[in-house]
């Protein structure tokens, strides 16, 4: 037969333990509200007096509940003054934007739906740079290549280690057709070698080149001190698109870190005065009021007055994000004469190092 139903009781070992602060009942909250309203003139309510009126509540519980009420009042006040909180539109309008935020906002308006295409193009540039012969030759151990008309063929690492002077084979990969380029290293056939790039090779040195390859410690050391510029370019390419690149060695990580740290040192070498003048004029053209330029929208871009240079980018910045058809921004870019890869029309001469004045 089924045993009779019995009610389960709380074990005795749990009866003496405190289960935490009990929730405030609506009756207690109304009572506390009446007590606080009666003491409205006081700067701070006294917890001792409130504990005498509220039976069953300690001073700590009353203080904790009052702090919760204060925090709720502050949140409600902020929500009324600033809709959306600190991320709301009113808070963003009252704050003065940083210069980089101004340029980022302008670039987003100019590029419109082409942001993914720009990111892919930047990644492709780094991918192409990974196969440059100079990048392969300046690696440690070097990667001499032979031009066979269709693609670059990478030699094995063992053949690359036999090369006596990889820095001397700088002009080799463009014209060498011998399958064993190590023997024909002294014959430079290509023209236009850069002596500055060939001087970069001695900076990266492999420790103990005469060490036996059989030892595991020696091979791990050579692996840590190996520099593969192809891998570095692939790492930068994948990082620009938010992906995971190949794992870099210790020296390769140091090269990437040195590149990042040298950005601040390279900025003063640019023609800063010319850059400032160009960007100031470009910003003035792109942010020109559109009301006065609406009449110039209908005629073709090449009119007599010089106002069309600012009309094109402005139409692009205002019209392309709101365009419903995907072909609309392309026509706008074509009419404006602005390259999406260079929306601010910065000349390439302004991105190179300025010539030092002759003394």
From Swiss-Prot:
Q: Name one Pfam family in it.
A: SNAPC2
Q: Which residues form a coiled coil?
A: none
Record's InterPro entries? SNAPC2
- Tell me if Cell inner membrane is a UniProt keyword of this record: no
Q: Name one GO cellular component term.
A: cytosol
Listed A to Z, the keywords are: Nucleus, Transcription, Transcription regulation
Q: Where is this region: Disordered?
A: 1-25, 158-222, 287-331
Q: Basic and acidic residues compositional bias: what residue ranges?
A: 293-303
Report the domain of life of the source organism.
Answer: Eukaryota
Gene Ontology annotations of biological process type: snRNA transcription
Q: Which GO terms describe its molecular function?
A: RNA polymerase II general transcription initiation factor activity
The listed locations are: Nucleus
Instruction: Specify residue ranges for compositional bias: Basic residues.
Output: 1-11
Q: Is Secreted given among the entry's keywords?
A: no
Bias-annotated ranges (Polar residues): 308-325
**What does the UniProt record say this protein does?**
Part of the SNAPc complex required for the transcription of both RNA polymerase II and III small-nuclear RNA genes. Binds to the proximal sequence element (PSE), a non-TATA-box basal promoter element common to these 2 types of genes. Recruits TBP and BRF2 to the U6 snRNA TATA box.
Q: How does it assemble?
A: Part of the SNAPc complex composed of 5 subunits: SNAPC1, SNAPC2, SNAPC3, SNAPC4 and SNAPC5. SNAPC2 interacts with TBP and SNAPC4.
Q: What is this protein called?
A: snRNA-activating protein complex subunit 2
